[in-house]
Amino acid sequence: MIENIKKRRKKIKKLLKRKRRQKRINYINNLSITKFMSQIDDKLFLKIFKDNRRGYFKSFMKLMSRLGDGYVWAFLYFSLYMFRIKYAILYFARAAAAVFICIFVFLYIKSFFSRMRPYKKHDKIPIMYPPDKHSFPSGHTMVGFAISFSVGSYSFGSAILFYTIASLIAFSRVYVGLHYPLDVICGIVLGSVIGMLTNMAFYYMIGLPIVGHI
């Protein structure tokens, strides 16, 4: 009897939570500025994305989008270690800290805004692989630019390498139809800010330079 009451209470709490969340989403979506930005964002997205594209560039963009899952960053870290770059482990630790912060931040923001993916609005967009539900902001882009700011600050050469890859991943997320341009732009800003703050934190904690190397 008591267990049934507890189960009912849990169900009621979940239902109320869903209703509050839906009410918040509806409020945000009905704001004039939100509607205006969504219209511009949607038009820009449709110009970038075209479902009839074929060829090597589209295949390359698909590859870059998948590399954003973490494979390319792991390879680059391994390369840093193999080339015996001084304090590679510290730079790895700093980047890892930035990544964990990014994951926490973008999961919270995605849950708060609950913006639909482009494929849910446009029927002609094929799903390349099952992504998570929400679009805003782009988690891949956030992580890419946080890592680039963290590790790319080691030298000018590493900055060019990391930022080039991060930019390609960011563009590919729109090109293959997984994100709107605004998702990616906000991901760039948030990722860069998190990367900068992480660099500053490691500087004050252990003296690892914000820009450059020891």
What are these regions (language model features)?
Residues 123-214:
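Membrane-embedded catalytic cores of phosphoryl/pyrophosphoryl-handling enzymes
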Residues 2, 6-132, 142-169:
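Hydrophobic alpha-helical bundle signature of multipass membrane enzymes
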